Regions:
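Membrane-helix boundary/coupling elements in multi-pass transport proteins
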Residues: 42, 106-124, 235, 240-253, ...
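Membrane-interface loop-to-helix entry segments
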Residues: 123, 154-208, 264-268, 385-398, ...
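Membrane-interface "cap" regions at the ends of multi-pass membrane proteins
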Residues: 1-45, 50-54, 61, 68-72, ...
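Hydrophobic alpha-helical segments of multi-pass membrane transport proteins
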Residues: 128, 191-198, 330, 338, ...
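Loop-to-transmembrane helix boundary motifs in multi-pass membrane proteins
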Residues: 20, 25, 154-160, 254-275, ...
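Extracellular loop-to-transmembrane helix junctions
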Residues: 20, 43-148, 227, 267-270, ...
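C-terminal membrane-solvent junction of multi-pass transporters and transport-like membrane proteins
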Residues: 151-155, 350-360, 396-444, 465-469, ...
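Helix-loop-helix junctions that connect adjacent transmembrane segments
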Residues: 14-19, 56-57, 134-159, 183-316, ...
Length: 486
């Protein structure tokens, strides 16, 4: 059986099932912004500022450029093959089944870990919001065991509950999902703009000096962690993860050839502008070294420095909404990739079951929703978040390389959108991805290799034998042999 058997565009489109098509350009843009703006601003800017200083804004730009080049490649694939599955389906088209499975396996971990990691940050802001009203959860129920060495905790109850609520919303239909996301994203954007307008008056340009205290890439005495613009970009790259999930909505999108490219590129553009403005203001208000005091809630720290306590409750609410939309889009993308892999026979049929009433992959959505909820509730996964980055960067590399290959092997295939500047654009995307991967620590590589190995075991032990494409090809070959013998 061929490990690199491929699907054609016609096969991918013909196999798509009638999920309800309701998504338009506005909905896709909101979906992308919902996935991108959240953890990056409200959690990672603290660690990023300590790593790069005020040059964190450049780190965000570097990560955005990488995502922008990769986004153009995703957009071309999405317009060429508007199906669920995102990078998994595109890899099946360009490089064949084994590569597709590896990328799908990789994305499942990426989406689950990001949602679980964000649920931990969500819990922190939720507890702060409760404290503002004089309410307190039992400390044992505020975080997973081992999250805070100074406090005994056992279970992240708020994070567990919010993941279950999001899973329920996702399971009952795309209309409910998009309405919920659209409303939350608009509220989140309004709160971010309010913060910018209020905080900009407290900026002290002297806090931007030196602008890049650690340069491009360096090590500090006594530390194994790299510092500088590139390592910070590798950290905040986590902030941009999610725009690729927009392409997973292809089978629920009206006129996907046009609306998907617009949604992906608009969401990236809006998010990048807001990230750069926010980081410049935050490092202008608070000297970058002082973010060590506010590592878990950097935006709240900026508000504390300004003395605008009235704004704290509003921003905490914005953080909660922002991280809720991130989790929603990640769990949405994960369920659609599992749905596509199940349809291809690489995962059990259970994950491909479509609910008759809601027209959603109901069982698969709940399976991974529960898994993510329990992971975020019981496991300290903060040490694993860089796995999300290396997994996503790997997917970006495959998709970008796929565009190069498809332009060479199928130059005349219909494309509703053509990435400009090919072959330069995908090559630059690949180069930037490798630059960001170089900024990750070695433990991340080891963990990624372990997950990769587990995926190969699943593929050769289960998926290869049950591949729908493989069985179809085998049946066709057997029929030819039988006809020859007759």
């Amino acid at each position: 059986m061929d490990l690199f058997r491929k699907k054609s565009v016609d096969q991918l489109v013909a196999e798509s099932t009638p999920l309800k098509r309701t998504m338009r350009t506005f909905d896709l843009t909101m979906l992308g912004i919902g996935a991108i703006i959240g953890t990056g601003i409200f959690v990672l800017t603290g660690k990023g500022a300590l790593t790069a200083g005020p040059a964190l804004s450049v780190s965000f730009l570097l990560a955005a450029v990488c995502c922008g080049f990769a986004g153009l490649c995703y957009t071309e694939f999405a317009a060429m093959a508007p199906v669920s599955g995102s990078a998994y389906s595109y890899a099946y088209l360009a490089f064949g089944e084994l590569i597709a499975f590896v990328i799908g396996w990789d994305l499942i971990l990426e989406y689950a870990l990001q949602a679980a990691t964000v649920s931990a940050g969500w819990s922190g802001y939720f507890n702060k919001l409760l404290e503002g009203f004089g309410l307190h959860l039992p400390v044992e129920l505020t975080a997973a065991y081992g999250t805070n060495p100074d406090v005994t905790t056992y279970f992240n109850l708020p994070g567990f509950v919010i993941v279950l609520i999001i899973t329920w919303v996702l399971s009952i239909g795309i209309n409910q999902t998009k309405r919920t996301n659209d409303v939350m994203v608009l509220i989140k954007l309004a709160i971010i703009v309010l913060f910018i307008v209020c905080a900009v008056w407290y900026v002290k340009p002297s806090n931007w000096q030196p602008f890049s205290p650690y340069g491009i890439y360096t090590f500090q005495p006594g530390s194994t962690q790299p510092y500088g613009i590139v390592p910070a970009a590798s950290i905040v790259f986590f902030s941009f993860i999610g725009f690729d999930a927009v392409s997973s909505s292809a089978e629920e999108t009206i006129n996907p050839n046009k609306t998907l490219p617009r949604g992906i590129l608009l969401s990236l553009a809006v998010s990048t502008v807001l990230y750069v403005i926010m980081t410049l203001i935050m490092t202008g208000v608070v000297p970058y070294k002082e973010f060590a005091k506010y590592i878990d809630a950097p935006v709240a720290g900026v508000i504390l420095e300004t003395g605008m306590n009235w704004l704290a409750v509003i921003v905490n609410l914005g953080a909660l909404i922002g991280m809720t939309t991130v989790m929603l889009v990640q769990l949405y993308g994960q369920s659609r990739i599992c749905y596509a892999m199940s349809r291809d026979g690489l995962f059990p049929k259970f994950f491909g079951h479509v609910h008759e009433k809601y027209r959603t992959p109901f069982k698969g959505t709940w399976f991974f929703g529960l898994l993510t909820a329990f992971a975020g509730g019981f496991i300290n996964i903060n040490v694993l978040f860089e796995l999300v980055n290396i997994g996503t960067l790997s997917a970006f590399i495959i998709v970008s390389a796929g565009i190069l290959w498809m332009r060479k092997t199928q130059p005349n295939a219909p494309r509703g959108f053509r990435a400009p500047g090919v072959p330069v654009t995908p090559i630059l995307a690949i180069v930037f991805c490798f630059v960001l991967i170089a900024g990750l620590n070695w433990e991340t590589w080891v963990r990624f290799a372990v997950w990769f190995g587990l995926g190969l075991i699943v593929y050769f032990g289960y998926s290869r034998k049950r591949s729908k494409l493989g069985l179809e090809q085998k049946a066709g070959a057997d029929a030819k042999v039988a006809a020859t013998e007759d």
